Regions:
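Hydrophobic helical h-region of N-terminal Sec-dependent signal peptides
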Residues: 12-20
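Short, low-complexity, disordered segments immediately C-terminal to signal peptides
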Residues: 27-49, 56
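Short, glycine-/small- and polar/acidic-enriched structural segments
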Residues: 52-238, 242-243, 259-265, 280-287
Length: 406
């Protein structure tokens, strides 16, 4: 059994060398490969709207979902394929966007570039390889227009320091988030921690050690803290944190160096193959993106029209190519594989992501509350003791305008 697990783990490691925080939808991994050559767009790629045609005609009632809906299996916002139609900018404009990753969770952006959707909006796209915590201050000064990241401590600390940086659109959530009976990214633990592994009591994690790639400042700490709260546990106090690279977490669990870990795609499949030894304890919150794009003064002022056009392009890419089980579409998988420099088989081996450009109500507040609670651990994660109001850290207007709801 252990030999088979190790062989499978070695086979999977190649798919995750750059995934320190994919489950967090963000991070500071700067080892990002260069942009791959653009694959040829499928024939059905939309063209600019003909004169007189409503560019938002395909964005009906389903293009906006009640932001308070966090239910398992809730609908996600969608327009018809090809919508919203392009509305080219009057002047060629460059959008400078940073990301510490070039991985599948930013496929809407990478495929918008590869399939010419930015070109249709008269946008030049400049990809900057930079982790979120390093980029956020440059977003605040307007040197970077948009940053891929997570709703993490560095965002709120930047706001606390006077920068006007806001979460402007979401990214994705695992389709089965919230259903612990389905193996997926989440907190996995050794079965021998629990008196009844078939129904694990989170309270029994008290006194154990959890592996984390980043620590308490990552947005992943939010869903973990949320799961621990009903059991009366505080991450960093009742459950110790040990920083371990994501690719080493399975072996750390196997060797009992840690008793739990947030395990990413596709490494959790090794643990799922040994249900008598490991159990899934909690997942990402259901129906809730916890990362996405973050904008500052340039998107709110001088480049607002371009930032709206950028969102129009990525929303159109989601509606056209990345809806449903898109891993069944060989052309789309091939395009993603080329853009992120991975094998198509590695991509197809994991579930398709559920892309969601919307931001749920209260997500930013709940994340702040988690970071504030960590002061009990003796580690200063944020330097304020009350959450900022949502309208100071969230701005939904760019994506709403992109679908004709501005």
């Amino acid at each position: 059994m252990r030999i088979r697990k190790r062989l499978k783990l070695l086979a999977l490691l190649g798919a995750v060398l750059a995934i320190a925080l994919v489950a967090a939808s963000c991070g500071d991994d700067d080892d990002t490969p260069s942009v791959a050559p653009a694959p040829e767009a499928p024939a059905e790629a939309p063209a600019p709207a003909p004169a007189g045609e409503d560019p938002f005609a395909g964005c009906g009632a389903g293009a906006v979902i009640d932001p308070s809906d966090l239910s398992v299996g809730r609908p996600v916002a969608r327009c018809e394929p090809g919508y919203p139609l392009p509305i080219p900018l009057a002047e060629r404009t460059t959008i400078n966007m940073s990301s510490g990753f070039k991985l599948e969770f930013i496929a809407p952006i990478l495929l918008a570039e590869a399939f010419g959707e930015f070109e249709k909006e008269n946008i030049d796209f400049n990809f900057i390889s930079l982790g979120f915590s390093d980029a956020v201050s440059q977003v605040g000064t307007g040197d970077i227009d948009l940053a891929v990241g997570g709703t993490e401590a560095s965002l709120f600390n930047a706001v606390d320091n006077g920068f006007d940086v806001r979460w402007v659109s979401g990214n994705f959530f695992p389709p089965d988030a919230g259903d612990r009976t389905i193996a997926q990214t989440g907190v996995w633990a050794r079965a021998d921690v629990f008196s009844d592994p078939s129904n694990p009591d989170i309270a029994e994690l008290e006194g154990t050690t959890m592996a984390s790639a980043v620590g308490l400042s990552s947005v992943i700490a939010y869903p973990i803290a949320q799961a621990f709260r009903p059991a009366g546990l505080v991450l960093g106090v009742d459950v110790a944190i040990e920083r371990i690279p994501s690719t080493d977490m399975v072996l750390a669990l196997e060797n009992n160096a840690v008793q739990s870990a947030w395990v990413l795609d596709p490494l959790w499949s090794v643990l799922a193959d040994a249900p008598d030894e490991y159990v899934l304890v909690t997942t990402q919150p259901p129906g809730e993106p916890i990362g996405g794009l973050y904008g500052g003064p340039s998107c709110f002022e001088a480049k607002r029209d371009a930032c709206v056009a950028f969102h129009r392009a990525i929303i159109r890419t989601i509606n056209t190519y990345l809806t449903g089980d898109y891993h069944q579409d060989e052309d789309v998988v091939a395009a993603i594989a080329e853009a992120i420099e991975r094998d198509p088989e590695q991509i197809a081996a994991t579930p398709s992501l559920l892309f969601d450009w919307e931001i749920r109500e209260g997500s930013a507040t709940r994340a702040q509350e988690a970071f504030i609670s960590f002061t009990a651990s003796g580690e200063t994660v944020v330097e304020f003791d009350e959450p900022f109001p949502e309208d100071q850290v969230v701005d939904r207007s760019l994506y709403l305008e992109a679908i004709g709801r501005g």
